[in-house]
Amino acid sequence: MTRSAPRSIEQYLKALREELAGEDSALVQDALYDAEEYLRAEVAAHPDKSEADVLELIASTYGAPDEVASAYRDTEAKVKAAMTPPRKAPKSGAGAFFGVFLDSRAYTSLFFMLLSLATGVIYFTFAVTGLSLSAGLAVLVIGIPFFLVFMALTRVVSLAEGRLIEAMTGERMPRRPVHQGNAAGFWARVGQMLKDRRTWTTLAYLVSMLPLGIAYFVVAVVGLAISLSFIFAPLIELQSHYGWFGHTGDLYFSPEWLNSPWVLPVLMLAGVLLLTLLMHLARGVGRLHAMYAKALLVAPTAA
């Protein structure tokens, strides 16, 4: 290893970040958190030694930055291989178009669109209420503690949302928060938190989830309602005509041409096409939303 050994925790973290350059930002955040948590715990456990001495002491147990980075890359590759569904042979034409029904991510992304209305309302209410109470209580002695607790809860919610997005879309999201470092003093930590752009981008994400959740929910529900009603229209007509469930009588639609015999098969075909398009749309929305969430919730890889 040509690089000189780190003499401080900051140097170690910088070297580890450089070794992980180009990797997923969520992976980098997890690796940096684990390393900083371990290193600071070891330094605290040896108050009689300097950081340089502690780093030299644990070099053989925890590893150099390049060794740690390699271990994280190997572990990530194994986890991704285990979690990723087997890749099917590429299809073309109708196979590629209708093959979306065999993609589990299309279904989970559609479920995410339906769930987003509930999570959007919860996140928006949480963010707006927290900010309003923080501003209202700012003149009181409990104002600052309340704001700090609210910010801490915001990061917990952010981490939970990341896990939900990873489960629904497959996009890698952080499994660890960003380490708060070793800022000296209470006010230094507060200032560090306020200067962290993620503090504000996370709040922006939580607030934006309400309009996004409404849009996702409306598109999913309307798309499902129209496509499924078209698909099942012939079955409903047959049931009404033959009285399979104890009711007889034909259905009549307006305008009159909808009552033609050839319309029902066309409606069923249109429903299948609309449902297929909805599944493609849901999968695309899932991917785009995961990129949007990662941009706002994950710490940038550049320090």
Label for each model-derived stretch:
Residues 1-32, 38, 42:
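N-terminal leader/propeptide segments of preproteins
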Residues 2-3, 44-112, 173-198:
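Cytosolic juxtamembrane regions of integral membrane proteins
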Residues 100-131, 164, 189-224, 231, ...:
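Short, structured motif recognition centered on aromatic/hydrophobic residues
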Residues 131-146, 249-270:
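Hydrophobic alpha-helical transmembrane segments
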Residues 133-170, 272-280:
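Hydrophobic alpha-helical membrane-embedded segments
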Residues 163-190, 245-249, 294-303:
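Juxtamembrane inter-helical linkers in multi-pass membrane proteins
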Residues 179, 251-264, 271, 276-303:
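Cytosolic/matrix-facing juxtamembrane and C-terminal tails of multi-pass cellular membrane proteins
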Residues 231-259:
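Membrane-interfacial helical/loop segments at transmembrane boundaries in membrane proteins
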